[in-house]
Regions:
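Core subunits and conserved enzymes of cellular information-processing
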Residues: 2-185
């Protein structure tokens, strides 16, 4: 990843460079969990949180790893924890916290109907989302894009004001985000 002198790094390179030893699949989806509230929040960061649909603490969204999304992630990194979600955690998240309009759970029948038989089960769809081959938008407008999570069982292990690299909870966590998500489901 050497670049010519004076060239700027892309947002994806910055996010993965900040976490040495934990290089991510460039196509894998990211999960973002908002950890901090709205008090003393800069207006531009609040707008970015709204665009990401992270309006409350303990809300999570799954996003593709694109240039525009990575720019937004870079802006809100001091208020969210994010990382690479695996298929098993994604399946558990969709089954337990995924909702359709009317507050009904997402099940195999809904996934099969919404994806026009492309994915027969929630597990198959979750694997496709985790690998970046599908997005949550593929479920249509009836599926809610936000997962409302609980605070983690056992509490946060570090400060919600410090980054993960300095024994906090914020910022890029790589695959270790899956442990946090499982405790929040």
């Amino acid at each position: 990843m050497s670049s010519p002198r004076g060239a700027t790094q892309t947002a994806t390179q910055k996010a993965t460079a900040a976490a040495p030893g934990r290089r991510a699949d460039p196509n894998a989806s990211l999960i973002l969990v908002r950890l901090r509230g709205t008090v003393r929040l800069n207006g531009k960061i609040a707008d970015t949180m709204e665009m990401l649909r992270l309006n409350r603490p303990n809300h999570a969204v799954v996003i593709p790893r694109t240039e525009s999304y990575m720019g937004m992630v870079g802006k809100v990194k001091d208020y969210v924890a994010y990382g690479d979600i695996d298929a098993a955690t994604m399946a558990a998240l969709i089954k337990t916290r995924g909702r359709v309009m009317g507050d009904k759970p997402i099940d195999d029948a809904f996934v099969k109907a919404a994806t026009a038989d492309k994915y027969a089960t929630v597990d198959a769809f979750a694997a496709a989302v985790a690998s970046g081959k599908a997005t949550m938008k593929d479920l249509g407008e009836d599926a809610k894009p936000v997962f409302r999570l609980n605070p983690p069982v056992g509490g946060f292990k570090g400060s919600t004001k410090k980054h993960f690299t300095v024994k906090g909870e914020l910022g890029y966590r790589g695959k270790e985000i899956n442990e946090l998500i499982k405790r929040m489901i």
